[in-house]
A protein has these predicted regions:
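Periplasmic c-type cytochrome electron-transfer domains
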Residues: 368
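Beta-strand-rich ligand-recognition modules
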Residues: 1, 139-151, 155, 259-301, ...
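Beta-strand-centric surfaces of beta-sandwich/beta-rich domains
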Residues: 1-363, 387, 409
Length: 490
Protein backbone atom coordinates (compact mmCIF):
# COMPACT_ATOMS: atom_id res chain seq x y z
CA UNK A 1 0.00 0.00 0.00
CA UNK A 2 1.05 3.64 0.05
CA UNK A 3 0.60 6.91 1.92
CA UNK A 4 -0.27 10.23 0.30
CA UNK A 5 -0.38 13.57 2.13
CA UNK A 6 -2.35 16.48 0.72
CA UNK A 7 -2.92 19.98 2.05
CA UNK A 8 -6.38 21.14 3.06
CA UNK A 9 -6.62 23.71 0.25
CA UNK A 10 -4.00 22.47 -2.17
CA UNK A 11 -5.68 24.28 -5.10
CA UNK A 12 -4.29 27.55 -3.71
CA UNK A 13 -0.77 26.30 -4.21
CA UNK A 14 0.17 26.95 -0.61
CA UNK A 15 3.12 25.09 0.87
CA UNK A 16 3.01 22.72 3.77
CA UNK A 17 4.73 19.77 5.35
CA UNK A 18 4.10 16.66 7.35
CA UNK A 19 5.78 13.54 8.62
CA UNK A 20 4.78 9.90 8.71
CA UNK A 21 6.21 7.51 11.30
CA UNK A 22 5.54 3.92 10.28
CA UNK A 23 6.30 0.35 11.32
CA UNK A 24 6.66 -2.49 8.84
CA UNK A 25 5.21 -5.94 9.53
CA UNK A 26 4.82 -9.24 7.76
CA UNK A 27 1.38 -9.63 6.19
CA UNK A 28 0.26 -12.46 8.47
CA UNK A 29 -2.33 -11.28 10.99
CA UNK A 30 -2.21 -7.63 9.90
CA UNK A 31 -5.35 -5.91 8.63
CA UNK A 32 -4.78 -3.06 6.19
CA UNK A 33 -6.19 0.31 7.18
CA UNK A 34 -9.08 1.32 4.92
CA UNK A 35 -10.27 4.63 6.38
CA UNK A 36 -13.73 3.16 6.98
CA UNK A 37 -13.01 1.94 10.51
CA UNK A 38 -15.17 3.09 13.42
CA UNK A 39 -13.23 5.60 15.52
CA UNK A 40 -15.92 6.33 18.13
CA UNK A 41 -14.21 4.45 20.96
CA UNK A 42 -10.85 6.03 20.22
CA UNK A 43 -12.31 9.53 19.98
CA UNK A 44 -14.12 9.14 23.29
CA UNK A 45 -10.93 7.83 24.87
CA UNK A 46 -8.88 10.77 23.63
CA UNK A 47 -11.44 13.23 25.02
CA UNK A 48 -10.83 12.01 28.57
CA UNK A 49 -7.47 13.63 29.23
CA UNK A 50 -6.74 13.64 32.94
CA UNK A 51 -8.62 10.41 33.66
CA UNK A 52 -6.86 7.11 34.19
CA UNK A 53 -8.23 4.96 31.40
CA UNK A 54 -5.63 2.21 31.23
CA UNK A 55 -5.83 0.55 34.60
CA UNK A 56 -8.98 -1.60 34.81
CA UNK A 57 -7.81 -3.85 37.64
CA UNK A 58 -8.62 -3.60 41.31
CA UNK A 59 -6.36 -0.92 42.72
CA UNK A 60 -4.86 -0.42 46.15
CA UNK A 61 -4.47 3.29 46.90
CA UNK A 62 -1.59 4.65 48.96
CA UNK A 63 -2.52 8.19 50.00
CA UNK A 64 -0.67 10.72 52.13
CA UNK A 65 -1.51 14.30 53.08
CA UNK A 66 0.24 17.44 54.33
CA UNK A 67 3.87 16.39 54.24
CA UNK A 68 6.68 18.88 54.62
CA UNK A 69 9.93 18.12 52.82
CA UNK A 70 12.81 20.14 54.22
CA UNK A 71 15.58 21.50 52.02
CA UNK A 72 17.92 18.73 50.91
CA UNK A 73 15.72 15.98 52.34
CA UNK A 74 13.62 13.17 50.90
CA UNK A 75 10.46 11.31 51.87
CA UNK A 76 9.39 7.79 50.90
CA UNK A 77 5.86 7.57 49.52
CA UNK A 78 5.82 3.87 48.67
CA UNK A 79 7.83 0.85 49.79
CA UNK A 80 5.94 -2.17 48.50
CA UNK A 81 7.07 -5.80 48.30
CA UNK A 82 5.60 -8.35 45.93
CA UNK A 83 4.46 -8.32 42.32
CA UNK A 84 2.32 -5.67 40.68
CA UNK A 85 2.25 -2.45 38.71
CA UNK A 86 1.87 1.20 39.50
CA UNK A 87 -1.41 2.20 37.85
CA UNK A 88 -1.38 5.93 38.51
CA UNK A 89 0.52 8.71 40.26
CA UNK A 90 -1.04 11.95 41.51
CA UNK A 91 0.68 14.73 43.44
CA UNK A 92 -0.46 18.11 44.73
CA UNK A 93 2.00 20.85 45.65
CA UNK A 94 -0.07 23.87 46.82
CA UNK A 95 2.84 26.33 46.68
CA UNK A 96 4.36 25.22 43.40
CA UNK A 97 6.54 27.65 41.45
CA UNK A 98 8.91 27.48 38.48
CA UNK A 99 11.91 26.74 40.67
CA UNK A 100 10.11 23.88 42.41
CA UNK A 101 9.47 22.32 39.00
CA UNK A 102 13.21 21.84 38.66
CA UNK A 103 14.13 21.17 42.28
CA UNK A 104 11.51 18.61 43.34
CA UNK A 105 12.68 15.24 42.01
CA UNK A 106 11.06 11.83 41.92
CA UNK A 107 13.04 8.58 42.17
CA UNK A 108 11.45 5.19 41.50
CA UNK A 109 13.20 1.87 42.09
CA UNK A 110 11.88 -1.40 40.70
CA UNK A 111 12.90 -4.79 42.14
CA UNK A 112 15.56 -3.35 44.47
CA UNK A 113 17.75 -2.03 41.65
CA UNK A 114 20.79 -0.15 42.91
CA UNK A 115 20.13 2.78 40.59
CA UNK A 116 16.67 4.33 40.20
CA UNK A 117 14.73 3.37 37.10
CA UNK A 118 13.06 6.78 37.15
CA UNK A 119 15.03 9.81 38.34
CA UNK A 120 14.10 13.28 37.13
CA UNK A 121 12.35 16.49 38.12
CA UNK A 122 8.72 15.71 38.88
CA UNK A 123 7.82 18.24 36.18
CA UNK A 124 9.17 15.88 33.51
CA UNK A 125 6.87 13.11 34.67
CA UNK A 126 3.97 15.56 34.40
CA UNK A 127 5.07 16.75 30.95
CA UNK A 128 5.65 20.45 31.73
CA UNK A 129 8.95 21.91 32.97
CA UNK A 130 7.90 25.58 32.79
CA UNK A 131 4.48 25.63 34.42
CA UNK A 132 3.01 28.73 32.80
CA UNK A 133 -0.26 27.03 31.78
CA UNK A 134 -2.24 23.85 32.30
CA UNK A 135 -1.14 21.00 30.02
CA UNK A 136 -3.35 17.93 30.27
CA UNK A 137 -2.26 15.05 28.07
CA UNK A 138 -3.75 11.58 27.94
CA UNK A 139 -1.14 9.87 30.12
CA UNK A 140 0.41 12.75 32.04
CA UNK A 141 -0.38 16.31 32.95
CA UNK A 142 0.23 19.42 35.01
CA UNK A 143 -2.11 22.12 36.32
CA UNK A 144 -0.97 25.52 37.52
CA UNK A 145 -2.75 24.99 40.85
CA UNK A 146 -0.06 22.40 41.67
CA UNK A 147 -1.48 19.05 40.50
CA UNK A 148 0.58 16.48 38.58
CA UNK A 149 -0.51 13.10 37.22
CA UNK A 150 1.04 10.22 35.30
CA UNK A 151 -0.79 7.07 34.14
CA UNK A 152 1.89 5.03 32.39
CA UNK A 153 1.77 1.43 33.69
CA UNK A 154 4.90 0.68 35.72
CA UNK A 155 5.30 -3.07 36.35
CA UNK A 156 7.55 -4.71 38.92
CA UNK A 157 7.99 -8.28 40.15
CA UNK A 158 9.62 -8.10 43.59
CA UNK A 159 9.62 -4.60 45.01
CA UNK A 160 8.63 -0.99 44.30
CA UNK A 161 9.93 2.11 46.04
CA UNK A 162 9.04 5.75 45.30
CA UNK A 163 10.86 8.72 46.80
CA UNK A 164 10.33 12.48 46.52
CA UNK A 165 13.46 14.61 46.98
CA UNK A 166 13.65 18.35 47.66
CA UNK A 167 16.81 19.70 46.03
CA UNK A 168 15.91 23.33 46.68
CA UNK A 169 17.17 25.52 49.51
CA UNK A 170 13.75 25.95 51.13
CA UNK A 171 11.10 23.59 52.52
CA UNK A 172 8.45 22.28 50.11
CA UNK A 173 4.92 21.28 51.06
CA UNK A 174 3.44 18.15 49.49
CA UNK A 175 -0.26 18.68 50.07
CA UNK A 176 -1.41 15.29 48.81
CA UNK A 177 -0.08 12.19 47.09
CA UNK A 178 -1.88 9.19 45.67
CA UNK A 179 -0.20 6.09 44.28
CA UNK A 180 -2.47 3.40 42.86
CA UNK A 181 -1.06 -0.14 42.81
CA UNK A 182 -2.47 -2.93 40.69
CA UNK A 183 -1.81 -6.62 41.24
CA UNK A 184 -1.60 -7.19 37.49
CA UNK A 185 0.98 -9.80 36.54
CA UNK A 186 3.12 -8.99 33.51
CA UNK A 187 5.27 -11.67 31.79
CA UNK A 188 8.92 -10.92 32.52
CA UNK A 189 10.19 -12.24 29.18
CA UNK A 190 8.61 -9.53 27.04
CA UNK A 191 7.91 -6.72 29.50
CA UNK A 192 10.27 -3.85 30.19
CA UNK A 193 10.71 -1.69 33.26
CA UNK A 194 9.32 1.84 32.95
CA UNK A 195 12.43 4.03 32.92
CA UNK A 196 13.81 7.37 31.92
CA UNK A 197 17.22 8.36 30.61
CA UNK A 198 19.54 10.38 32.90
CA UNK A 199 18.07 13.88 33.04
CA UNK A 200 19.86 16.12 30.55
CA UNK A 201 20.41 19.33 32.50
CA UNK A 202 20.00 22.70 30.84
CA UNK A 203 23.02 23.58 28.71
CA UNK A 204 24.18 24.63 25.25
CA UNK A 205 26.49 22.56 23.08
CA UNK A 206 28.08 24.25 20.08
CA UNK A 207 27.92 22.86 16.56
CA UNK A 208 26.24 19.53 17.34
CA UNK A 209 22.84 18.25 18.41
CA UNK A 210 21.99 18.41 22.10
CA UNK A 211 22.37 14.75 23.17
CA UNK A 212 19.19 14.42 25.22
CA UNK A 213 19.35 10.64 25.63
CA UNK A 214 21.38 7.50 24.97
CA UNK A 215 19.88 4.13 25.92
CA UNK A 216 21.59 0.74 25.95
CA UNK A 217 19.71 -2.56 25.91
CA UNK A 218 16.33 -3.57 24.58
CA UNK A 219 12.99 -1.80 24.76
CA UNK A 220 10.75 0.80 23.22
CA UNK A 221 10.68 4.55 23.63
CA UNK A 222 7.21 5.81 24.59
CA UNK A 223 7.62 9.53 25.41
CA UNK A 224 9.95 12.48 24.93
CA UNK A 225 10.14 15.65 27.03
CA UNK A 226 12.37 18.55 25.95
CA UNK A 227 12.62 22.14 27.20
CA UNK A 228 14.41 24.99 25.41
CA UNK A 229 15.63 28.48 26.36
CA UNK A 230 17.11 30.90 23.83
CA UNK A 231 19.56 33.68 24.69
CA UNK A 232 16.61 36.02 25.26
CA UNK A 233 12.83 35.84 25.11
CA UNK A 234 10.71 36.08 21.95
CA UNK A 235 13.42 34.74 19.64
CA UNK A 236 12.37 32.17 17.06
CA UNK A 237 13.78 28.89 18.38
CA UNK A 238 11.82 26.24 16.52
CA UNK A 239 14.04 25.23 13.60
CA UNK A 240 16.08 22.50 15.30
CA UNK A 241 15.21 19.00 14.11
CA UNK A 242 14.68 16.10 16.49
CA UNK A 243 16.78 13.13 15.37
CA UNK A 244 16.48 9.58 16.66
CA UNK A 245 19.09 6.91 15.92
CA UNK A 246 18.16 3.30 16.58
CA UNK A 247 20.46 0.29 17.01
CA UNK A 248 23.63 2.07 15.90
CA UNK A 249 22.44 3.12 12.47
CA UNK A 250 24.28 6.17 11.10
CA UNK A 251 21.14 7.46 9.36
CA UNK A 252 18.48 8.78 11.75
CA UNK A 253 15.34 6.68 11.61
CA UNK A 254 13.21 9.57 12.83
CA UNK A 255 13.91 13.17 11.86
CA UNK A 256 11.43 16.00 12.34
CA UNK A 257 11.06 19.17 10.30
CA UNK A 258 11.87 21.58 13.11
CA UNK A 259 11.14 21.20 16.80
CA UNK A 260 7.44 22.03 16.90
CA UNK A 261 6.56 19.54 14.17
CA UNK A 262 7.80 16.73 16.41
CA UNK A 263 4.84 17.41 18.71
CA UNK A 264 2.57 17.79 15.65
CA UNK A 265 2.31 21.57 15.42
CA UNK A 266 3.50 24.07 12.82
CA UNK A 267 4.82 27.61 12.56
CA UNK A 268 6.97 27.48 15.67
CA UNK A 269 5.91 27.93 19.30
CA UNK A 270 3.95 31.23 19.08
CA UNK A 271 0.75 30.46 21.01
CA UNK A 272 1.33 28.40 24.15
CA UNK A 273 -0.22 26.34 25.46
CA UNK A 274 -1.05 23.98 22.60
CA UNK A 275 -2.20 20.54 23.70
CA UNK A 276 -3.62 17.39 22.13
CA UNK A 277 -3.94 13.94 23.77
CA UNK A 278 -0.53 12.72 22.58
CA UNK A 279 1.55 15.86 22.99
CA UNK A 280 1.94 19.60 22.92
CA UNK A 281 3.88 22.45 24.50
CA UNK A 282 3.82 25.17 27.14
CA UNK A 283 5.93 28.31 27.43
CA UNK A 284 5.96 31.91 26.33
CA UNK A 285 5.57 33.09 22.76
CA UNK A 286 8.48 31.64 20.70
CA UNK A 287 10.58 30.74 23.78
CA UNK A 288 11.11 29.35 26.30
CA UNK A 289 9.11 26.26 25.46
CA UNK A 290 8.62 22.85 27.03
CA UNK A 291 7.29 20.11 24.75
CA UNK A 292 6.05 16.57 25.31
CA UNK A 293 5.28 13.83 22.81
CA UNK A 294 3.93 10.36 23.50
CA UNK A 295 4.99 7.58 21.16
CA UNK A 296 2.23 5.07 21.80
CA UNK A 297 0.92 3.86 18.45
CA UNK A 298 4.27 4.84 16.95
CA UNK A 299 6.63 3.65 19.69
CA UNK A 300 10.30 3.36 18.75
CA UNK A 301 11.50 -0.22 19.38
CA UNK A 302 15.21 -0.79 19.86
CA UNK A 303 17.25 -3.96 20.39
CA UNK A 304 20.71 -2.65 21.26
CA UNK A 305 20.59 1.14 21.65
CA UNK A 306 18.68 4.35 21.00
CA UNK A 307 19.98 7.91 20.80
CA UNK A 308 17.80 11.02 20.85
CA UNK A 309 19.08 14.49 20.01
CA UNK A 310 17.83 17.89 18.91
CA UNK A 311 19.45 20.64 16.85
CA UNK A 312 19.99 24.22 18.00
CA UNK A 313 18.57 26.13 15.04
CA UNK A 314 18.48 25.21 11.35
CA UNK A 315 21.93 23.62 11.33
CA UNK A 316 23.18 23.98 14.92
CA UNK A 317 23.88 27.63 14.22
CA UNK A 318 21.90 29.12 17.12
CA UNK A 319 22.55 29.54 20.84
CA UNK A 320 19.89 27.41 22.54
CA UNK A 321 19.94 25.67 25.90
CA UNK A 322 18.10 22.35 26.00
CA UNK A 323 17.13 20.05 28.84
CA UNK A 324 15.00 16.93 28.96
CA UNK A 325 14.63 13.19 29.20
CA UNK A 326 13.18 10.19 27.36
CA UNK A 327 10.77 7.69 28.90
CA UNK A 328 10.85 4.08 27.76
CA UNK A 329 10.16 0.48 28.68
CA UNK A 330 13.45 -1.35 28.79
CA UNK A 331 15.53 -4.36 29.70
CA UNK A 332 19.29 -4.25 30.18
CA UNK A 333 20.08 -7.09 27.77
CA UNK A 334 21.29 -6.27 24.27
CA UNK A 335 19.54 -8.76 21.97
CA UNK A 336 20.86 -7.51 18.61
CA UNK A 337 24.49 -8.56 18.10
CA UNK A 338 26.72 -7.84 15.11
CA UNK A 339 28.24 -11.03 13.67
CA UNK A 340 29.77 -10.00 10.33
CA UNK A 341 30.37 -7.16 7.88
CA UNK A 342 31.16 -6.89 4.17
CA UNK A 343 33.10 -3.83 2.96
CA UNK A 344 32.96 -3.44 -0.81
CA UNK A 345 35.90 -1.01 -0.65
CA UNK A 346 38.12 -3.83 0.63
CA UNK A 347 39.36 -6.54 -1.75
CA UNK A 348 40.13 -8.71 1.26
CA UNK A 349 36.57 -8.42 2.56
CA UNK A 350 35.15 -9.08 -0.91
CA UNK A 351 37.19 -12.28 -1.22
CA UNK A 352 36.44 -13.48 2.31
CA UNK A 353 32.68 -13.16 1.72
CA UNK A 354 32.75 -14.56 -1.85
CA UNK A 355 31.06 -11.39 -3.08
CA UNK A 356 30.19 -11.01 -6.73
CA UNK A 357 27.93 -8.75 -8.78
CA UNK A 358 26.59 -9.53 -12.25
CA UNK A 359 25.13 -7.52 -15.12
CA UNK A 360 26.68 -4.22 -16.23
CA UNK A 361 28.62 -3.77 -12.99
CA UNK A 362 29.79 -0.20 -12.25
CA UNK A 363 31.91 1.00 -9.37
CA UNK A 364 31.49 4.69 -8.50
CA UNK A 365 33.44 6.79 -6.02
CA UNK A 366 31.27 8.86 -3.70
CA UNK A 367 32.38 11.74 -1.48
CA UNK A 368 29.39 12.89 0.52
CA UNK A 369 27.77 13.05 3.96
CA UNK A 370 25.23 11.24 6.10
CA UNK A 371 22.03 12.96 7.12
CA UNK A 372 21.77 13.94 10.75
CA UNK A 373 24.12 15.08 13.47
CA UNK A 374 27.31 14.27 11.53
CA UNK A 375 26.19 15.85 8.26
CA UNK A 376 29.35 17.96 8.01
CA UNK A 377 31.76 15.01 8.20
CA UNK A 378 32.89 13.93 4.72
CA UNK A 379 32.75 10.18 4.12
CA UNK A 380 34.54 8.72 1.08
CA UNK A 381 33.78 5.32 -0.42
CA UNK A 382 32.75 3.38 -3.51
CA UNK A 383 29.33 2.08 -4.45
CA UNK A 384 28.59 -0.90 -6.68
CA UNK A 385 25.73 -0.81 -9.19
CA UNK A 386 24.57 -3.76 -11.29
CA UNK A 387 21.60 -4.96 -13.30
CA UNK A 388 21.33 -8.69 -12.57
CA UNK A 389 22.20 -9.64 -8.98
CA UNK A 390 24.83 -9.62 -6.26
CA UNK A 391 25.63 -12.47 -3.89
CA UNK A 392 27.76 -12.96 -0.79
CA UNK A 393 28.22 -15.24 2.21
CA UNK A 394 28.02 -14.03 5.83
CA UNK A 395 28.50 -15.58 9.27
CA UNK A 396 25.72 -15.63 11.85
CA UNK A 397 24.99 -17.20 15.23
CA UNK A 398 23.26 -20.57 15.05
CA UNK A 399 21.24 -19.55 18.13
CA UNK A 400 19.69 -16.61 16.29
CA UNK A 401 16.01 -15.67 16.36
CA UNK A 402 16.25 -13.82 13.07
CA UNK A 403 18.80 -11.69 11.21
CA UNK A 404 19.01 -8.02 10.27
CA UNK A 405 20.94 -6.90 7.18
CA UNK A 406 22.15 -3.30 7.11
CA UNK A 407 23.19 -1.75 3.82
CA UNK A 408 25.29 1.35 3.15
CA UNK A 409 24.35 3.00 -0.15
CA UNK A 410 24.04 6.18 -2.21
CA UNK A 411 20.54 7.63 -1.87
CA UNK A 412 20.91 10.10 -4.70
CA UNK A 413 18.45 7.97 -6.65
CA UNK A 414 14.91 7.55 -5.37
CA UNK A 415 12.92 4.36 -4.69
CA UNK A 416 15.57 1.67 -4.42
CA UNK A 417 14.21 -1.87 -4.20
CA UNK A 418 15.43 -5.46 -4.32
CA UNK A 419 14.29 -9.03 -3.76
CA UNK A 420 16.30 -10.90 -1.13
CA UNK A 421 17.11 -14.62 -1.26
CA UNK A 422 18.60 -16.65 1.61
CA UNK A 423 20.24 -19.95 0.66
CA UNK A 424 18.23 -19.95 -2.56
CA UNK A 425 14.87 -19.23 -0.90
CA UNK A 426 13.22 -15.85 -1.42
CA UNK A 427 12.19 -13.85 1.65
CA UNK A 428 8.58 -13.41 0.61
CA UNK A 429 7.45 -11.44 3.67
CA UNK A 430 8.67 -8.17 2.21
CA UNK A 431 10.56 -6.42 -0.54
CA UNK A 432 13.69 -4.51 0.46
CA UNK A 433 12.47 -1.03 -0.40
CA UNK A 434 13.61 2.51 0.42
CA UNK A 435 11.49 5.38 -0.87
CA UNK A 436 13.74 8.23 0.30
CA UNK A 437 16.19 10.25 -1.72
CA UNK A 438 18.68 12.99 -0.82
CA UNK A 439 20.99 14.45 -3.49
CA UNK A 440 22.91 16.51 -0.90
CA UNK A 441 23.51 14.13 2.02
CA UNK A 442 23.84 11.02 -0.06
CA UNK A 443 25.11 8.30 2.28
CA UNK A 444 22.30 6.14 3.65
CA UNK A 445 22.08 3.16 6.00
CA UNK A 446 18.89 1.10 5.90
CA UNK A 447 17.88 -2.30 7.26
CA UNK A 448 16.18 -5.47 6.07
CA UNK A 449 14.69 -8.03 8.47
CA UNK A 450 15.09 -11.74 7.69
CA UNK A 451 12.68 -13.88 9.75
CA UNK A 452 14.04 -16.76 11.82
CA UNK A 453 12.50 -19.43 9.60
CA UNK A 454 15.23 -18.65 7.02
CA UNK A 455 18.11 -18.45 9.51
CA UNK A 456 17.52 -20.45 12.70
CA UNK A 457 20.12 -23.14 13.41
CA UNK A 458 22.47 -21.94 10.67
CA UNK A 459 26.03 -20.64 11.11
CA UNK A 460 26.22 -18.86 7.77
CA UNK A 461 23.93 -17.55 5.04
CA UNK A 462 24.27 -17.21 1.28
CA UNK A 463 22.59 -13.92 0.40
CA UNK A 464 21.42 -12.99 -3.08
CA UNK A 465 20.21 -9.46 -3.92
CA UNK A 466 18.10 -8.99 -7.08
CA UNK A 467 17.28 -5.34 -7.91
CA UNK A 468 13.71 -4.41 -8.79
CA UNK A 469 12.69 -1.29 -10.70
CA UNK A 470 10.00 0.84 -9.04
CA UNK A 471 9.82 3.45 -11.81
CA UNK A 472 7.65 3.59 -14.92
CA UNK A 473 10.81 3.88 -17.00
CA UNK A 474 12.14 0.61 -15.63
CA UNK A 475 15.25 2.25 -14.19
CA UNK A 476 17.20 0.24 -11.61
CA UNK A 477 18.49 2.49 -8.81
CA UNK A 478 19.83 -0.14 -6.38
CA UNK A 479 23.43 0.19 -5.21
CA UNK A 480 25.56 -1.02 -2.30
CA UNK A 481 28.80 -0.12 -0.57
CA UNK A 482 28.73 -2.17 2.63
CA UNK A 483 26.66 -4.75 4.48
CA UNK A 484 26.55 -5.39 8.22
CA UNK A 485 24.93 -8.47 9.70
CA UNK A 486 23.16 -8.58 13.08
CA UNK A 487 21.56 -11.52 14.87
CA UNK A 488 18.66 -11.43 17.29
CA UNK A 489 19.66 -13.46 20.32
CA UNK A 490 16.77 -13.66 22.75
Amino acid sequence: TDVKLEGYERTKGEGGWGHVVYHTYADNGIKTFTGKENYDTLIQLWKKQGSNLLCKDQLAYHRKSEQKINAGESITLLDEKGEGAIGSLKFYFPEINEQHLQDVWIHMFWDAHQQPDISCPLACLGGNSLGFHDTNYLLSGYNTDGWFYNYFPMPYWKHAKIIIENRSGVPVSLGFSEIAVSRSVYPTSNTGYFRNTPYYTRKHVAGIDSPIAAIQGRGKMVAAHVTCHAERSHIISCEGDVRVYIDGKRTPQVESDGSESYVCYGWGFPTPPEVHPMGGYDGLSDNPWSMTRFCIGDSYPFYSELKFGIESGEYNNQYLEHSGTIFYYGQDKNVLVKTDSLDLNSSRSIKRHSYKAMGNVRRTKLESFFEGNEDRILYVGETVRFESFSSFRVNISSQNEGVRLRRLSDQNDVRQAARVFVDGEEVTERLWYVADSNPYKRWLEDDFEIPAKYTKGKKSLNIRIVPVSMSKEGKNTWNEAEYQVFCYNN
